[in-house]
Amino acid sequence: MTVDELIDSWEGAWSGKDPDAFAPLCAADLHYEDPLTAEPLEGVDELVGHAERLWAAFPDVRLERTGERLANRRYVAAPCKLLGTHKESLEGLPATNRFVVLHCVFYCELQRGRLLRVRGFFDLYDAAVQLGVLPSRGSLGEKALLVLRGFGLRAARGQ
């Protein structure tokens, strides 16, 4: 299997909501993390559990390739976007029924043609804005939030 075929299959496993599709792609001692995992996940079973929570919250979720993948024999960086509607609660966040588009990059380490380590990167703040949980960047709401968090107080006093 080529690197492109491997990553296409990885994206297909997420989009197809097929828990059995991950095992042939991943090393037995897979290490996975993304902004929604509190701790790194170890093994395919933990990855599948994470995927099933996301599939339940975003039943129409899919990953789409967004650009060229950068790869050598050991590493690959795969840009994509995640699209889906938040229909059920996720980690205590009630369903918002909002559609999100998150640009992501999966940075992967390969071992014998399988995924050994995978780190997913996306902007969690942007996700929260799209879900209506946090104010948009540059808005009055964001400025108020920053003041409440203690940012900008010195500048306000000095003016």
Where do the PLM segments sit?
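C-terminal and inter-domain tail/linker signature
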Residues: 1-159
